[in-house]
């Protein structure tokens, strides 16, 4: 699917870089650019009785195997999704932009941390994760301005079921009129039928 419904010149240059194996919080005013702090998920530590006082590598591997099992049963979602100032160089190395208001021609950089994707076996001792991403650009009236299915695909192969995987997404919008828009990424897990959507409202200032 590909949409091009805007008469004015709209040059969309898309480049997404994922990395190295290693939603945007809703505002009171959808278009304001102000963000509420995201509530931190409450993490309950494992009961101390289940972890030896001095864990061995074998104990840690058993815990990691349990995490992998839970991970594969988790719906595909995003632990983090935000506009950032610069591309992340490592997993977790993001610099939150703190605003969704952009100058005309300024690129939109997004940092995404997917959770719940699967792994396909590769050979006898390796695993491959992979994600395919669609995008849509909508105006404040909900009309589609541009979009493309499967415009980017990423994969990584490792001897372990890697969970430190992130996406650097870059979108340059040239010739876009000042106003409010929504950038939508739909992420498909290549190892399953799981899908998740990330909506990032933003404003081009006049």
Positions of PLM-derived features:
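Sec-dependent N-terminal signal peptides
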Residues: 1-27
